[in-house]
Amino acid sequence: MDGKAPAAFVEPGEFNEVMKRLDQIDEKVEFVNSEVAQRIGKKVGRDIGILYGGVIGLLLFLIYVQISSMFM
């Protein structure tokens, strides 16, 4: 072997057909990846919302306890 990569000769029509099919497969893979990322984002957003709600609820409760203890 003289260090060169082997060359293959393909008809241009066949090559273009294969490239179109690869583009379609690539589009499908990108679509699925984006759907998965969107679902993960929704789950993370829900979890963050629950945490913020808990923290705000706890702060409101502590403020209520502080204020109610001042008037006793």
UniProtKB/Swiss-Prot annotation:
GO terms for molecular function: tetrahydromethanopterin S-methyltransferase activity. It comes from the Archaea. Its EC number is 7.2.1.4. It catalyses: 5-methyl-5,6,7,8-tetrahydromethanopterin + coenzyme M + 2 Na(+)(in) = 5,6,7,8-tetrahydromethanopterin + methyl-coenzyme M + 2 Na(+)(out). Pathway: One-carbon metabolism; methanogenesis from CO(2); methyl-coenzyme M from 5,10-methylene-5,6,7,8-tetrahydromethanopterin: step 2/2. Its main location: membrane. GO terms for biological process: methanogenesis, from carbon dioxide; methylation; one-carbon metabolic process. GO terms for cellular component: plasma membrane. HAMAP family: MtrG. Belongs to the MtrG family. NCBIfam families: mtrG. The complex is composed of 8 subunits; MtrA, MtrB, MtrC, MtrD, MtrE, MtrF, MtrG and MtrH. This is Tetrahydromethanopterin S-methyltransferase subunit G. It comes from Methanosarcina mazei (strain ATCC BAA-159 / DSM 3647 / Goe1 / Go1 / JCM 11833 / OCM 88).
